[in-house]
Amino acid sequence: MRGAGQQPIIVLSQGTKRESGHQVQIGNINACKTIADVIRTSLGPRAMLKMLMDPMGGIVMTNDGNAILREITVKHPAAKSMIEIARTQDEETGDGTTSVIILAGEVMAHAQTYLEQKTHPTLIIKAYRQALEDMIQWSENKFSKTVDITDDAEIAKVVKSCLGTKMISKWMDLAVNISIQAVKTIRVEKAGVREIDIKRYCRIEKIPGGRIEDSQVVKGIVVNKDILHAKMRRRIENPRIVLLDCNLEYKKGESQTSLEIMREEDISAILEQEEQAIRKQCDEIIKLKPDLVFTEKGISDLAQHFLLKAGITCLRRLKKTDNNRLARVCGARVVHDTSDLRDEDVGTKAQLFEVVKIADEYYTYVTAETTTACTVVLRGPSKDVINEVERNLQDSLHVVRNIMINPKLVPGGGALEMALSREIEQQGAKMDGVKKWPYKAIGLALEVIPRTLIQNCGGSTIRKMTELRAIHAQNAENWTFGVDGTSGDLVDMNKLEIWDPLAVRIQVLKTAIETSVMLLRIDDIVSGTKKAVGGEKQEMMPQ
């Protein structure tokens, strides 16, 4: 760049790389298409599995979109944002991770045509936003039905359509029952608002060995811990429980101190002082007559001795999350210092404490009939199988939660996408100006979902898609027609009982289009200098 005196003005440093204009947009579109192509075959009941090696040398086998992309290392910033949307989709709704990536890739691919025709990105974005608003409105008002959330059989149908594409589909009824039971256990109504916090109050405990059919929901908590002393009780009915967040051992000073001891009896006095401090802590606990003490920190041998003499069973080094879940089960309050313990801090709601040996490990069960925290115990032949079953179960738990919070359903199997595509086609025909073309392009992009389902079944894509378009165009009542993902035939989803939660599909549409809009607005990528490596790094270090 030159100023008035023809002197070059350097704005960016030499190591900085800059790409701008049309080249950047095409690069972003290609990155999105590449990511979409990676997991295109992982959509639907006939989905292929991907085998991935993680950096630690472990193997992941899955067809879960988010799990696949999480293991892939990419350089391109647009590809990174695509991986991010799969994670967002998984956290928000637990399902639709593969769909959202495929749809975003297709929406970006359709934008390329208009960018090459020199259409301004702002016009494309405006049309995309308009299409998104219309689609959300149609999905909620035209193409959805409400489900009765008190009827488990109705919810089960929806969960089955979600799990049909997963590995756990062979144990469908078991997975459905576990999901519904777990979500109903942790459901809490506060001031008319329904709260279902799966992450915090529903833990999945994986125990290798046994059969998948042995998996169950435990109303309470299960932790991989054993009692500290062989003479402590392993089974207590209706226990009084104290939960602590402090050490039951002598507190060491903050700074390093040294003592000079001149007489022998001084050592005894110091040791006596340590013992007194621990005895005081234990007496404060024993005063409340608990049966069980759980702490997040350590318990010294001396403290174990005092508690054992008082007939108290204790466990140490619990995770904070487990302690909070335990507080919900037994009604106790987590106390940070033994001197603050009051009678109301003791939990009495738990009905049974039991230490059980499963395979070579000991597991502690604390259960109650009426509780708002639960643990799903998963069994299976190997670690890989259990990990995949856990991923599938997480998805089905989220599906049940979504239905409980928003009981509206839309047809699966690409039926909703085809119905929306037809509406966009009709609405686009009434529009005028340049905006109508990108608007109608969204309708074409939506067809990627049923098309991919047909492809993954090995069906004839062109013939089936033409047939499906004809069915939807023939009669407005045919909005429930879609693709049977197992056989590749065109079926009424109402008869096949394949329904998705509205929240999932709307989130897919929102995330895919909003990401495309964000990426289309990028016209410049400036990448800074990379860190110096090897010899250069050593040279730069101060002498």
Curated annotation (Swiss-Prot):
Record NCBIfam families: chap_CCT_gamma (TIGR02344), thermosome_alpha (NF041082), thermosome_beta (NF041083)
GO terms assigned for molecular function: ATP binding; ATP hydrolysis activity; ATP-dependent protein folding chaperone; unfolded protein binding
InterPro entries listed in its UniProt record: Chap_CCT_gamma, Chaperone_TCP-1, Chaperonin_TCP-1_CS, Cpn60/GroEL/TCP-1, GroEL-like_apical_dom_sf, GROEL-like_equatorial_sf, TCP-1-like_intermed_sf, TCP-1_chaperonin
GO biological process: protein folding
Stored Gene3D superfamilies: GroEL, GroEL-like equatorial domain, TCP-1-like chaperonin intermediate domain
Keywords attached to this entry: ATP-binding, Chaperone, Cytoplasm, Microtubule, Nucleotide-binding
Assigned protein family: Belongs to the TCP-1 chaperonin family.
Residues that span the membrane, as ranges: none
Predominant place of localization: cytoplasm
Any single GO CC term annotated in Swiss-Prot or TrEMBL for this entry: chaperonin-containing T-complex
Subcellular location: Cytoplasm
Recorded phenotype for the gene knockout or disruption: RNAi-mediated knockdown results in severely reduced microtubule growth rate.
Effect of residue 14 to R: Homozygous worms show reduced motility and a reduced number of progeny, while heterozygous animals have a substantial crawling speed defect. Homozygous worms have aggregate-like actin puncta throughout the intestinal cell cytoplasm
Pfam family, one: Cpn60_TCP1
The protein, known as: T-complex protein 1 subunit gamma
Organism lineage string: Eukaryota, Metazoa, Ecdysozoa, Nematoda, Chromadorea
Main function: Molecular chaperone; assists the folding of proteins upon ATP hydrolysis. Known to play a role, in vitro, in the folding of actin and tubulin. Plays a role in microtubule polymerization.
Source organism per UniProt: Caenorhabditis elegans
